Amino acid sequence: ASADEVGAAFDRVVASAKQHVPGATIDGVAVQRMEKQGTEVIIGVTKDPQFGPVLMFGLGGVLVEVLKDVAFRIVPIVERDARQMIEEIKGYPLLQGYRGQEAADLGKLRALLLQVSSFIEAHPEVAELDLNPVFAYKDGAIAVDARIVIE
């Protein structure tokens, strides 16, 4: 889209918001790229009172709520832990490419687990972190939604 098209779209969004909530103060509008659908996974961290930060991996989106098919490790993790977390979920065949679906980039998912583990080590103030969903593709992965809670 051109700069003029973006400006016109911004004006429409602001006008619509003010129509629905006349007293609203609007400081800006978030614009982000729409990503193509991929295999949905979740990566999360919670703090256990006894063990400290615990990393979670599983199928994402609504599947995590329905299937509760997740793996956990205490932070920090190493490459072997990341590989095992991915391979031990029941949904692993989906990540390998099931019934004609493209396989997910397992190396990128392992790297993402390791990066989240390192991030949590470097930022002990993070109480919770959720990347859900992460779209896994044959050649990469991208977090589409994220939530971080700071203590």
Task: Give a label for each model feature.
Residues 1-151:
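ATP-dependent carboxylate/acyl-activation modules
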